[in-house]
A protein has these predicted regions:
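C-terminal membrane-solvent junction of multi-pass transporters and transport-like membrane proteins
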Residues: 369-448, 463-465
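Hydrophobic, membrane-embedded alpha-helices of multi-pass small-molecule transporters
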Residues: 28-47, 180-186, 196-259, 282-304, ...
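Membrane-interface "cap" regions at the ends of multi-pass membrane proteins
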Residues: 1-60, 202-208, 226-236, 457-476
Length: 476
């Protein structure tokens, strides 16, 4: 697997791309993982996602419990992916070639790219609203200004994103503490919690919202832990990533639940203004608008950076290369942000409805991939990967792994009868009282099928991690 020259590994702009990170370039600690994922989740889109639990018919009390359960389940799945990063030193999706084949991995990777674009677009709408309020411009100008910041940060890469994550985590904590204090001081929260009307459909819908939120990070979470020293504890990485993500998302979604319950029908299309209005007016409101915009910087940069990784993985699979040029990197990043910005500009007036459909439908495509990847890594291969073979269609992992691809497709199909979104509603949803259990099947069925299939296969698993240098390739 070819690699970039190291260059100035401590410089402002990252040199590495999808290639293996050698031990000499590993750095960072678990605290940076916690702050990165805390800041990535403690933001406006998570608030809106929590609000959907109430907007779509749930009460406050049971919505809070369901969201927490979904966070814990989805967060565990997401953190298991994150723990792979230090051991492999590779981006998340390129490691999917072990399960799907060098060409076969492009099937889930293409869908991952769509995910990045969708999340970036929806996040840009909310960040654009905050920038517009802060600078007294229209929403379109706010979206464009926000996109320009994301381009710069993403081009700088890994170190810059982690640095901004640390700053954003501090700003986010201060902002949320203030907004919660204002919320509890000025509103009767007890009355909201006392108004209970449990329905299984609403409860599982709320679980689906938070579980899908967490699982959707799975395809790129290891991208941001791959520079950690290989000696980093896998359990420590699991908890640093998982706790940061779950705590940040749950705090934001709890606030969203209360905000939507207080706002009623006035929440839709005015999400940012209403949330800030709960906190304060005047100069303090301006600071809250800034915190909202800055809070979106981290996660949108993650999306753009992950998109670059995924696009580079697709192209390198056909070219048999393990790295991409700096020019290609810039083109991938700029292209992705342009597309997501255009979507944000064209869809900003119907954001809430479209985002609901997007995030729930998205889950059907990523739970099977996640199940296959995790079962393969933790039950069979661990960190025993042949890194050079990841770029060789004629190597150990081949072009296509028919078994994994078939199980992935089955994992999607088995969910369809039970899937309930604005995009598609399965035929068995009404029989279950409107309850959506598709994501549970999407995790369990592919996991069981892949475990059985992999145990019976004759594929070759190396005895240890094989690095590029051991195949006589250029010294990284």
């Amino acid at each position: 697997m070819s690699t970039h020259p190291t260059g100035n590994t401590g410089g402002l702009i990252e040199v590495r791309s999808i290639d293996f990170i050698p031990d000499a370039e590993r750095h960072g600690g678990l605290l940076s993982q916690f702050t990165l994922w805390l800041s990535a989740n403690m933001q406006i889109t998570a608030i809106v996602t929590g609000a959907l639990a109430v907007v779509l018919g749930g009460d406050v009390f049971w919505s809070l419990i369901a969201l927490l359960l979904g966070q814990l389940i989805g967060g565990a799945v997401m953190a298991l992916h994150g723990a792979q990063g230090p051991q492999l030193g590779l981006p998340q999706m390129i490691s999917s070639r072990v399960q799907f084949g060098v060409y076969g991995a492009m099937i889930p990777i293409v869908l991952v790219c769509l995910m990045y674009i969708g999340f970036s677009a929806s996040g840009s709408v909310l960040a654009g609203q905050a920038v517009a309020q802060l600078l007294h411009v229209d929403d379109a100008a706010g979206i464009l200004l926000f996109a320009a910041v994301i381009v710069v940060l993403t081009v700088c890469g890994y170190r810059a994103i982690h640095f901004v994550g640390r700053i954003a985590s501090v700003i986010g904590i201060v902002a949320f503490v203030y907004m919660f204090a204002q919320l509890f001081a000025n509103h009767d929260i007890g009355a909201l919690l006392a108004n209970r009307h449990f329905t299984l459909a609403s409860f599982l819908l709320s679980m689906s919202l938070s579980a899908s939120w967490q699982i959707a990070f799975g395809p790129y979470v290891a991208d941001y832990s791959r520079y950690l020293p290989r000696s980093t504890s896998s359990l420590g990485t699991f908890f640093a990533v998982g706790l940061g993500s779950v705590i940040g998302a749950q705090a934001a979604m709890v606030f969203g639940v209360f905000a939507a319950a207080l706002a009623g029908s006035g929440f839709a299309h005015h999400e940012v203004a209403y949330i800030v209005g709960l906190g304060s007016t005047g100069a303090v409101a301006a600071l809250l608008y800034f915190s909202i915009a800055f809070g979106k910087v981290t996660v949108t940069a993650l999306n753009a950076y992950g998109s670059f990784m995924s696009m580079a993985t697709i192209v390198s699979g056909f070219r048999g290369k393990g790295a991409v040029s700096s020019r290609s990197r810039l083109l991938y990043i700029f292209g992705m942000i342009c597309v997501s910005t255009l979507i944000a500009l064209s869809g900003r007036h119907s954001f809430l409805k479209e985002f609901t459909a997007f995030i729930l439908f998205l889950l059907a495509f990523f739970t099977p991939w996640s199940a296959i990847n995790l079962v393969d890594y933790y039950c069979f291969t661990r960190s025993r990967y042949d890194v050079p073979a990841l770029s060789d269609p004629d190597g150990r992992y081949g072009r296509w792994n028919a078994m994994a691809i078939a199980i992935y497709v089955i994992g999607i199909l088995v969910q369809l009868p039970f899937l309930s979104t604005h995009v598609y509603t399965g035929p068995l949803v009404d029989a279950l009282g409107g309850t959506d259990i598709s994501w549970i099947l999407g995790l369990v069925v592919p996991a069981v099928l892949y475990y059985v299939g992999a145990r019976g296969s004759r594929r070759s698993i190396p005895e240890r991690l094989i690095l590029p240098l051991e195949r006589g390739e250029a010294q990284p």
